[in-house]
Amino acid sequence: MATDAAELFKEALSLFPGGVNSPVRAMKHLPTPLIVKRAEGAFLYTIDGVKLIDYCMGFGPLILGHRHPTVLEAVRRSLEDGWLYGALTRNEVELAKEINSSIRSVEMIRFVNTGTEAVMNAVRLARGFTGRRYIVKFEGNYHGAFDYVLVKAGSGAATWGVPTSAGILEDAVKYTLVVPYNDVEALERVFREHGSEIALLLVEPIAGNYGLIIPDLEFIKATRELTERYGALLLFDEVITGFRVGLNGAQGLFGIKPDLTTLGKIIGGGFPIGAFGGRRDVMSMITPQGPVYNAGTFNAHPVSVAAGLATIRVIKSGGVYEVANEAAERITEAILDSASRSGFDIVVKRIASMFQFYFKKGDVKTPADVRASDEKLYLTFHREALSRGVYFTPSQYEVNFTSAAHSRDVVDETIRVIEEVFKALKTKAH
């Protein structure tokens, strides 16, 4: 059996494509990717015994921190009762009620296993409900790894779907239209040209899969106004933002009520889950009540539901957002201050307990702005911070997250490391 990270990764390379089971974990700028043995609170512990302050937090689900005792106890109780029934359970009803009481647009809900599944079924549902073919998505918005939405924008204001991945048939994306994010004029144009044929507009109300891009209010309001005008459905993909930016999600922050919402991450408390929900008349089309098919052996898995229910109830008990948001605020202020004192151009974006930073001048409002950032310098920053015990997200195209476990002492240590890293970067630059 492999005894250290290098040996284990060598074995992994022979077993998994690229040595990992999700591409972002590859961390190709490091000699070996991060290999974790255990976690507690705000900390990860690697297979080589290194303790790290974690700002990835499982890429978002762990808003309470690792191994929160209430969630751990809920999972233990669930496992003691049994772990799969193929039947309705009390906890899934209770979790649905907790979601509905916070995200009021979700009048009915269907639990699935991933965010990808949630969006995939929501697209089918929208087409079934409207009888239309086209869907519209935005450049840089990620809605899961399935063919209809795994497309990017080409040149011009709007483009026919262009597959992002090998293996996707052009026919699979010929009814997917892609529009630049934060561009109201382009969105208006695509609705003028195709509005009567559009079934669904999908949007990340806060883009969290191309770094962190916060929308202009005019833009996000236009998504609702145009879909209502042309009779299309509006889907807010809140897999990341649901229960992260507040109890009411991003739709609560912006005061917009979408027709459909997709959720994941936090509603599973760190266990696999996804959900799509929305207007009662739309959701009533789902089997067995209606003709739009969805099924799954592991839908509303008892352990995932137990963890999610415990997580949301802890959030609702108070204090979680205050700690997590303050931690993110202090860290982003420290990054801005240290970068300025060291002579680096930097753009820092934060909303609630989500943040990301970019080595560039100007602002970041579109995916093109993210691409224009100095990715090499970000990776150098990441490597330097990691060597000092702080694990920021390993790509400028991802997002950092804080949690209720990021206490003032943890943040103090993080700020000390940030200051050290910028001093080291300044020395290397000269």
From Swiss-Prot:
Q: For this protein, what reaction is catalysed?
A: (S)-4-amino-5-oxopentanoate = 5-aminolevulinate
Gene Ontology biological process: protoporphyrinogen IX biosynthetic process
Q: Where in the cell is it found?
A: Cytoplasm
What would be one Gene Ontology cellular-component term for the protein?
Answer: cytoplasm
Membrane spanning stretches: none
Family under the similarity heading: Belongs to the class-III pyridoxal-phosphate-dependent aminotransferase family. HemL subfamily.
Its protein name is Glutamate-1-semialdehyde 2,1-aminomutase
What is the native source organism of this protein?
Caldivirga maquilingensis (strain ATCC 700844 / DSM 13496 / JCM 10307 / IC-167)
